[in-house]
Amino acid sequence: RWSSPGYADLMVGTSADVAFADAWLKGVRHFDVRAFYQSALKDATVVSPLAGTGRKGLQRSIFNGYTDTAVDEGLSWSMDGYINDFAIGNLAAALAAAPAADDPYAAHYADDAAYFHQRALGYVNLFDPAVGFFVGRDAKGNWREDAKHFDPLRWGGDYTETNAWNMAFHAPQDGAGLAALYGGRAGLAAKLDAFFATPGAFHVGSYGEPIHEMLEARDVRMGQYGHSNQPSHHIIYMYDVAGQPWKTQDKVRDVLSRLYIGSEIGQGYPGDEDNGEMSAWYLFSAAGFYPLRMGTPAYVIGAPYFPHMDIALDNGRHIVIDAPAVSDTNRYVQGLRVNGQPWNKLTLPHALLAQGATLEFLMGPTPSRWASDEAALPPSLTPHGRPQPLRDPGAATSSTPTIAGLTALFDNDSASEAVLPATSTTIAWHYAAPRRVALLTLTSAARAAAPSGWQLQASVDGHHWRTLDTRQQQRFAWPRQTRAFAVPAPGEYAHYRLHFDAAPDASPRALAEIELLGPTP
């Protein structure tokens, strides 16, 4: 969770997940990716018995789609979780595309990829359109505060070492989907403009007194932008997503020119140098590109800081960045050539840079329309429209034979569970209108073994049934683990049933939760 070293109950997110997934997807092969994947899977799907490991609030957040307000700073836990889920999904997709013959988990990567990619869209669950910000919700879905009492300048509460303004852009994995929440790319740009224009005042909120991050953010003098701490570091580059890259270029130059020079107002290193991120931000930004969408083998383009920069790679090759006219005045990119060829996109593939490359920037004193059309922008999970994570809307359920405490399987909380008979057992769902089920999830119980074989069936009329998916010899590696199973050919049905095979050892089995996930109408 946090490089302390060792386990420590600090900060939010299990960001080793995105860090190692990103490394693998960029070609780093000096670690055991299978062991890492299982570690990331455990972070994302297993309720940890230890406070210093795993993700907080997971017993409900997996099913609600967000970490609720019963968890301190649950919104920040949620938002970092979506970024990590995105990276896990991308790694799973890569491993599914090229499975190793001796990998015992090979058959499951594709299911995981589908599951984690849709989980990465869960940020939409915390966006309150009444206030235009991400806001915490309780387990029942109620907002922490209504529009009358909401204060985007207040630190803490839902937000770790920051406020609602600095969490307003915390979905780099799905920039176009985020933009849709603000009315489109122009709306995202307007929200960013307001962010940088809002005076750098702060309200201490749940912290009770100023903490150093508040004071450092104020001293940045770029509105609410707090370059002093990690939650803000990607925000400038979100102008690329909004289709206004000249504003990224302008503000990157401002940060590099003012916030790293020292002496004037005590800035120098402008804040927390946690695990080297402040230096890394400088080096990437000075080179003219930045890893905005961690967990993908690509970078977004900003603007170079130096007339000439040469990065020597371990393979003996070089990334050469030339911008002979660049200056505080000539801060805007007018054009770019990569290895001598015109480049009109805002992304650079990692593989291209890793083999050595020459980037030639043409700079000028005024903004240009270079790489600002739709086709030039960074990709997103949701290319168009509002994000639509899969949901389980609930339905009338029954079981044969009768399962005592059946409702525990549908209460969005893995702390409760139900015991299934050792004999074959069927659970049925009856919806008021036909719906499509794309994923089945099962969550193992705390102690008893989970079922190992089942068939998911569906019916239009409740009488004629079609088998959608069959699984055999399934295993849950950990207690209270949520596993996802993709439906190969989903259709529109009003009736579903899950038929569990009899236990091979004739002993009862147990589950903590079942979900039938599909798109919402």
Residue ranges, per PLM feature:
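C-terminal beta-strand-rich structural cap/linker in extracellular carbohydrate-active enzymes
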Residues: 350-383
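Hydrophobic, well-ordered secondary-structure elements that form the walls
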Residues: 175, 235, 283, 336, ...
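Short strand-turn-strand beta-turns centered on an Asx-Gly dipeptide
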Residues: 314, 338-341, 461
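Active-site core of glycosidic bond-cleaving carbohydrate-active enzymes
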Residues: 13, 17, 27-320, 324-325, ...
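Predominantly extracellular/luminal regions of secreted and cell-surface proteins
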Residues: 386-412
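Aromatic, loop-rich ligand-recognition surfaces of beta-strand-rich domains
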Residues: 404, 408-472, 479-521
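Aromatic/His-enriched, Gly/Pro-containing loop or helix-boundary segments
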Residues: 2-14
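Short coil-to-beta strand junction motifs in C2/discoidin
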Residues: 304-306, 328-333, 447-455
